[in-house]
């Protein structure tokens, strides 16, 4: 007989599935190619899950405030990094009451989080206010050209889904416009991670990934980024576009 606690995977089993491990690897592999100065920074990591992205910044000499809304995920983060003097772990719900007087950090890191929020505009504004230099953002998006966040239902019981049960699939236009309301220099990457959920051709009618998800990577900066890896405008189809598996 299966016990009630065995009916769903633990947070570690959920986040360490083959899909998640490959997805994380492709995203951080891509981040490392973008030419950003991410060494020896103070970093606010939001929606950290179980902390699988945290080591990327620790390996670069950063000090990280690792935040997450779910208690079960925070327990895993504390087990992993509790003895590391460069990691502070704290509870933060981006869909909850956000502290107006929170500290600022050189870099705010928000990968795979925005589309799990029911109030994405408020969260983006708050994160921009926390960023001294950069806000790094990766999120699921819609193919729409409308300036809309497009709210959707999600499974609140899942350790990686919207804690309120409501998420969003904003258009790239919406994300760029909200960031431009708070930050002077906003870009989308000229390249994409080598993964099927990151399309190169945005002229299609919808995602080619079997999950039905399409993703994009953005940065909001206090200073201009004169780098070939970033673009101030959308590319609807990258040169030499090929399918990522």
Regions found by a protein language model. Give the residues of each.
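Conserved N-terminal segment of class I S-adenosyl-L-methionine
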Residues: 1-104, 212-221, 225-245
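Conserved class I S-adenosyl-L-methionine
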Residues: 136-160
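A short, conserved alpha-helix within the catalytic core of class I
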Residues: 116-130
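Short alpha-helix
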Residues: 164-190
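Conserved catalytic loop of SAM-dependent methyltransferase domains
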Residues: 185-221
């Amino acid at each position: 007989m299966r016990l009630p606690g065995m009916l769903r995977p633990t947070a570690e089993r959920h986040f360490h599935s083959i899909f998640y491990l490959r997805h994380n690897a492709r995203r951080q592999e891509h981040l490392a190619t973008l030419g950003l100065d991410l060494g020896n920074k103070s970093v606010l990591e939001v929606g950290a899950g179980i902390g699988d992205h945290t080591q990327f910044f620790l390996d670069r000499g950063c000090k990280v405030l690792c935040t997450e809304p779910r208690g079960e995920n925070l327990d895993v983060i504390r087990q992993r990094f509790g003895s590391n003097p460069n990691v502070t772990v704290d509870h933060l719900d981006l869909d909850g009451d956000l502290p107006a007087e929170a500290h600022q950090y050189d870099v705010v890191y928000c990968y795979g989080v925005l589309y799990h929020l029911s109030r994405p505009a408020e969260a983006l504004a708050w994160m921009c206010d926390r960023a001294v230099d950069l806000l790094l953002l990766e999120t699921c998006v819609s193919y729409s050209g409308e300036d809309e966040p497009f709210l959707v239902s999600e499974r609140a019981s899942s350790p990686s889904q919207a804690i309120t049960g409501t998420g969003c699939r904003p258009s790239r236009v919406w994300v760029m416009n909200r960031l431009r309301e708070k930050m002077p220099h906003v870009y989308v990457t000229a390249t994409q991670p080598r993964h099927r959920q990151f399309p190169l051709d945005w002229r299609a009618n919808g995602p080619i990934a079997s999950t039905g998800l399409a993703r994009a990577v953005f940065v909001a900066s206090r200073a201009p980024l004169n780098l070939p890896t970033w673009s101030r405008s959308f590319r609807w189809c990258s040169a030499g576009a090929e399918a990522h598996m």
